[in-house]
Amino acid sequence: MLQFLNRCSKGRGAWLLMALTALVLELVALYFQHVMLLQPCVMCIYERAALFGILGASLLGAIAPKSPLRYLAIFIWIYSAWKGVQLAWTHTMLQLHPSPFTTCDFFVSFPSWLPLDKWFPAVFVASGDCAVKQWEFLSLEMPQWLVGIFAAYLFIAILVLISQFVKPKRRDLFSR
């Protein structure tokens, strides 16, 4: 399996497939926000930014999958997925155990050199409350789904990183 992941990480197809999954999740989030009129909270926006990190990592990996740039893409992928798990877990705890003493921020605070909420307000401006449960599917809230999604991204990313140190098996069909 690790040899298979090693081969996949050196081709564009797997990276583009990951980009497609992240893009679909981003489009679903925008559908929830602009069509279903669910108001994203600050944690939702941070989770969205982590998903954009995974999307960016996959596009970086697709640019030059056979070069050392692939390692940078894998590390960005792992970092974004890890932050996504942390954010989604914190968001889940805010929803499952609401407290007047533990709340999320009122406004998103991106770095001054990357004010995404100013550049793309339709995507990165928060208007909801983190403790409010707005959507449920199969008895799980949205942040609970995101814990699983980000954990899957993280698990696969760690396997891909480990596979980089496995030598691919040579397929020499005519040497026997």
UniProtKB/Swiss-Prot annotation:
GO terms for molecular function: electron transfer activity; protein-disulfide reductase activity. Disulfide bonds join C41-C44, C104-C130. GO terms for cellular component: plasma membrane. Its main location: membrane. It is a multi-pass membrane protein. It comes from the Bacteria. It is found in: Cell inner membrane. Required for disulfide bond formation in some periplasmic proteins. Acts by oxidizing the DsbA protein. HAMAP family: DsbB. NCBIfam families: PRK01749.1. This is Disulfide bond formation protein B. It comes from Yersinia enterocolitica serotype O:8 / biotype 1B (strain NCTC 13174 / 8081).
